[in-house]
Amino acid sequence: MEFSRDAGMMMENKRNVCSLGESSIKRHKSDLSFSSKERKDKVGERISALQQIVSPYGKTDTASVLLDAMHYIEFLHEQVKVLSAPYLQTVPDATQEELEQYSLRNRGLCLVPMENTVGVAQSNGADIWAPVKTPLSPAFSVTSQSPFR
C-alpha cells in the first residue's frame, strides 16, 4: 500500500511538473502568436500604405502590390539615370573651336577680364570663401583702428 501511495505521489508530482511545463510552453506560444499577429497587422498596414502609393485603384493583394512597387522602383531608377546623364557626361576630346562656340566671351557676356579669373579656375573652390588677410584688413594689423572715430 505504501508503495502504491508513493508511486501515486510521484505520478502527481510528475503531472504537476508536466502541467507546469506545458502551461509555460502554452504561455510562450500565446506570446508568440500575439507578437506574430502584431507583426502580421503591421505588415498588412504597410502593404496597404504601399498600395495607396503605387496603384491606388488597382489590385489590393499583397503579391500584386509588391510587384507594382518593384516596377515603380525600377522606373524611378531609370528616371534618375536619364535625368542625371547630362550632368555625368564629359566632353570627349572637344576641339578649341567647338568649345569657343559655348564661350561667354564670344557672346559678349564675359564681365570680368580673363586674367583675373586664373586664380579661381585653378583653385579647389574651398579657398574662395576664406577670409583674405591684407594690410588693410583688421585681422592683419595688430592694433586695429576704426575708420569711424
UniProtKB/Swiss-Prot annotation:
Q: Which GO terms describe its cellular component?
A: nucleus
Which ranges carry the bHLH domain? Answer: 27-76
**Keywords of the record:** DNA-binding, Nucleus, Transcription, Transcription regulation
Compartments annotated for it: namely: Nucleus
Q: Which GO terms describe its molecular function?
A: DNA binding; DNA-binding transcription factor activity; protein dimerization activity
Family stated for the protein in its record? Belongs to the bHLH protein family.
- Its protein name is Transcription factor bHLH153
